[in-house]
Amino acid sequence: MLKKTAIAAVLLGATALGACTTIDPYTGETVRNNTGTGAIAGAVGGALLGYLTNTSDGEQGRKNALLGAGIGALGGAAVGSYMDRQQAELSRQLAGTGVSVTRDGDNLVLNMPSDVTFAVDQADIQPRFDRVLGGVATILNRYPQTLVDITGHADSSGDDAHNQALSERRASSVAERLTGQGRVLPGRLFVMGRGETQPIASNETADGRAINRRVEIVLRPFRG
């Protein structure tokens, strides 16, 4: 059975689709614009708390935390435009950093490869990555109706238990950077470690293993 562990970062005491493609002026890449999407559908004081085995409960808890903090959910046609603006800002902020920004429906995916993020077998954020996360945090704070899913991944070099723990520590390091210095509301975050179970390249080569050692951040609109 694939190992899956989810860690929730929560607040203490606070409680149809159309698309077109355009050229991103900052990256020169073709991107899909989803402004029409959705038109039909009308503290942590320095630590992450606990383990969740029921991710649906964790999702509802996160929504409750945002509502308790006075952050309202997005609705209908506002979602596509909101995510379009956020995508443009992130693409500009992350240009030339090695971090990619891709669109998946109404979600944004930030893929952060190992040459940007962590040294081999380490979960301490490298200085270059720290600066990248600082820029991401600044934009996230301008878009408070965005949920943040952080997933750590490892290659297959170690045993399963080691890789699972390493992926969790890496994801937690990113979350702590965003909520600490970055001051992103902790209740917006959900943190996961996937170990070696979701490779995106072959683990048979050094280059492939380097690609698989990564952190992914998925940004999702907070819907009602």
Language model features by range: what are they?
Residues 1-8:
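Bacterial N-terminal signal peptides that target proteins for export
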Residues 17-20:
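N-terminal Sec signal peptide cleavage junction
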Residues 23-89:
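Short, low-complexity, glycine-enriched hydrophobic/amphipathic alpha-helices that associate
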Residues 43-47, 65, 85, 89, ...:
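Extracytoplasmic/secreted proteins, especially bacterial periplasmic and envelope-associated proteins
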Residues 76-79, 117-125, 160-163:
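Second-shell loop/turn segments in exported
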Residues 83-115:
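Amphipathic, membrane-active segments
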Residues 93, 117-151, 175, 180, ...:
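Periplasmic peptidoglycan-binding/anchoring modules of Gram-negative envelope and division proteins
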Residues 151-224:
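Periplasmic OmpA-like peptidoglycan-binding domain that tethers envelope proteins to the cell wall
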